[in-house]
């Protein structure tokens, strides 16, 4: 048993010495971004001080074997290939394909001669980033010896509030993928499903060649585009093992709305971390009406009045006041029956309301 473990570790070490082929497909025309006013390809848009492609490259070791696939229009612009070749990576094969709308599987199939049959291949889309540990992922696929793997996330992410859908995985209890749908969740609550980040792993380059060709020949598409996610269904049909590798956070920039939502959240958290510049409004009063019952919160088990519910270690009312400009005086309007529950001794002037009124406007009228 101990000898077997040693041999397994040696095998993993040898596999680590062989770098995965990382193919980044970015040959699309970014039509929605063009309509939204962007004048560069999606992968060259600035996000948090770096271009999208830089975020993607940073997901992998600098000595990875990269293949970038762009379209001919971008390739004809001398600044774009020059920029891509200047990135901090050791090995890059830059390819271009005529402009088309057939999806990433078609683009990658055009350059299968760059893929060795026995090498591991990761295919990465060009419009996101994520919180992950590449070396943990590498160890996961090598230890499990899976034939395919989809990097996924679950739970709340801001872009999940929008109407756009991505690829979703149906799994068993061991996170073995049973089926993948593109642009469509399996249930009415997509936040509980495994959603693909846009990173797809294949144990062998021969799988990429065989199943990408099969997907196109069988014309398995969504809106006339051939997606990498759907290739995994073909592997599954042939009895090959495909697993989910879960990451805690994913940053989606696939559409202008996704990017706008991300930037809003990013700006907010940056201000929280760095501290907002204090705004002072002289000759003004801040009125905080909080004399409601908070019935929706109590119905789901909250015992304290809503203003005192903790949000990231602070009272909800503190969070609200922190977002507001500093004024000469703060007046709180609170419900009298909550007097013993609300720690308002240090909050300046408090007006206690005898009964629940018809909304915040009525409460404000009482306290100012």
What are the language-model segments listed below?
Residues 1-2:
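Serine residues within intrinsically disordered or low-complexity segments
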Residues 22, 193-286:
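Conserved alpha/beta core of the MobA/IspD/sugar-nucleotide pyrophosphorylase nucleotidyltransferase superfamily
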Residues 130-219, 340-342:
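Conserved core of the sugar-phosphate nucleotidyltransferase
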């Amino acid at each position: 048993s101990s000898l077997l473990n040693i041999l397994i570790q040696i095998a993993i070490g040898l596999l680590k010495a062989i770098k995965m082929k990382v193919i980044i497909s970015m040959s699309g025309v970014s039509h929605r971004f063009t309509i939204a006013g962007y004048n560069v390809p999606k992968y060259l848009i600035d996000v948090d001080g770096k271009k999208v492609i830089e975020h993607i490259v940073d997901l992998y070791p600098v000595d990875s074997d990269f293949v970038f696939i762009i379209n001919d229009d971008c390739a004809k612009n001398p600044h774009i290939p020059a920029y891509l070749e200047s990135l901090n990576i050791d090995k890059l094969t830059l390819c271009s394909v005529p402009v088309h709308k057939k999806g990433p599987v078609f683009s990658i199939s055009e350059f299968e001669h760059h893929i060795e049959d026995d090498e591991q291949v990761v295919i990465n889309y060009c419009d996101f980033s994520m919180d992950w540990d590449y070396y943990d992922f590498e160890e996961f696929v090598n230890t499990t010896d899976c034939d395919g793997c989809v990097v996924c996330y679950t739970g709340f992410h801001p872009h999940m509030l929008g109407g756009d859908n991505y690829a979703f995985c149906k799994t068993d209890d061991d996170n073995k993928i049973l089926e993948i749908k593109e642009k469509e969740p399996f249930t009415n609550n997509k936040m509980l499903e495994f959603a693909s980040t846009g990173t797809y792993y294949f144990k062998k380059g021969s799988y990429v060649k065989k199943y990408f060709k099969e997907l196109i020949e069988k014309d398995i598409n969504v809106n006339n585009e051939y997606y990498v996610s759907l290739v995994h269904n073909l592997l599954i049909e042939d009895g090959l093992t495909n697993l989910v590798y879960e990451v805690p956070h994913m940053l989606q920039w696939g559409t202008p709305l996704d990017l706008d939502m991300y930037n809003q959240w990013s700006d907010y958290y940056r201000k929280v971390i760095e501290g907002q510049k204090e705004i002072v409004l002289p000759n003004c009063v801040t009125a905080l009406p909080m004399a409601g019952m908070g019935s929706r919160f109590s119905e789901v088990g909250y015992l304290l009045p809503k203003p005192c519910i903790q949000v990231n270690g602070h009272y909800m009312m503190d969070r609200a006041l922190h977002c507001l400009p500093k004024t000469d005086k703060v007046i709180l309007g609170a419900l009298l029956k909550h007097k013993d529950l609300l720690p308002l001794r240090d909050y300046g002037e408090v007006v206690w309301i005898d009964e629940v009124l018809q909304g915040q406007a009525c409460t404000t009228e009482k306290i100012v």
